[in-house]
Amino acid sequence: MRVILAPMEGVVDDLMRDILSSINPYDLLVTEFVRVVDQLLPEKVFLKLCPELLSGGYTPSGTPVRVQLLGQEPNCMAENAMRAIELGSHGVDANFGCPAKMVNRSNGGAVLLQYPNTIHDIVRAMRQAVPAEHPVTAKIRLGYEDKSLFMENALAVYEAGATELAIHARSKVDGYKPPAYWEYITEVRERLPIPVIANGEIWNRDDAKRCMQVTGCDSIMIGRGAISLPNLADTIKTGATPYSWADTLQLMLSYTQRELSGRKSDYYPARIKQWFSYLNRQYPEADTLFRELRIYKTTEEIVRVLEQAQHHLNQ
């Protein structure tokens, strides 16, 4: 079984990858997307989104990281795929699933699910540019407005030479609304000879088991669930006990220390509030604490609330 951390734009940055890989036995982490338009991007763009490239493409805990690209022009995607590999990325992934309106309006992400030939051309160009020993992968949804082109898109990725395919079991229009339609993944997994990775609505170990039973996949990708329950991958792979609220609060304080000592400290209030929006699903205590700290705007005020909460737990 493989468990892969999904790319989540604006959520799973290098610090979050560091934190989560330090407490989970992830097999692979995928970055937020690098936006490719019409040129070969400078190294600094890749290093900003994936500073792990400076350490051989690994997090401090030794988990490999794969750069994800988002774009619509095959040759530019190919050039930038090769650059990612040269910089140390463990393979390169193509994003055909992002549902964000701003991205779709500029012909990126899930909007390309309406054009299987374009998907094929992009993956084909990337595969031809990247040496065979390096994986070229793709992530798709079930479709854009409907699921009518789902199998055609999956075949386009495979026939273009992709190493494996991750599928988020919802369409663009579905967004993130439950349920996830895992049964569609089953059809592709039975038809394609390459590994298929199942993604969508995996919030706990039982969800992971059901997803693998329905799809027949032995690889899963987790995103929002991994932020909601920080040690989700560990519970899935080893049967570890899910983190208690005390465990999670301590992890948040560890995250806080790293955030404030790094380059992103100005963004801390927004980042920590965003994390609380995911934790609310798993921990009632998170909702209570968020109601207290949401009125604060400064880092100092928020850190004080978190430290007070931990102090009360330890009494």
UniProtKB/Swiss-Prot annotation:
Residues at which FMN binds: 7-9, 68, 139, 199-201, 223-224
Database matches in InterPro entries: Aldolase_TIM (IPR013785), DUS-like_FMN-bd (IPR035587), DUS_fam (IPR001269), DusC (IPR032886), DusC_C (IPR042270)
Keywords: Flavoprotein, FMN, NADP, Oxidoreductase, RNA-binding, tRNA processing, tRNA-binding
Keyword Plastid (UniProt): no
Site (Interacts with tRNA): 35, 95, 176, 271, 273, 278, 294
Pfam families with a match to the protein in the record: Dus
Catalytic reaction annotation: 5,6-dihydrouridine(16) in tRNA + NADP(+) = uridine(16) in tRNA + NADPH + H(+); 5,6-dihydrouridine(16) in tRNA + NAD(+) = uridine(16) in tRNA + NADH + H(+)
EC number per UniProt: 1.3.1.-
Active site: 98
UniProt GO molecular function: flavin adenine dinucleotide binding; FMN binding; tRNA binding; tRNA-dihydrouridine16 synthase activity
Keyword tRNA-binding: yes
Recorded superkingdom: Bacteria
Cofactor or coenzyme needed: FMN
Function, in words: Catalyzes the synthesis of 5,6-dihydrouridine (D), a modified base found in the D-loop of most tRNAs, via the reduction of the C5-C6 double bond in target uridines. Specifically modifies U16 in tRNAs.
Family: Belongs to the Dus family. DusC subfamily.
HAMAP family in UniProt: DusC_subfam
UniProt name for this protein: tRNA-dihydrouridine(16) synthase
Species per Swiss-Prot/TrEMBL record: Shewanella oneidensis (strain ATCC 700550 / JCM 31522 / CIP 106686 / LMG 19005 / NCIMB 14063 / MR-1)
Gene behind this protein: dusC
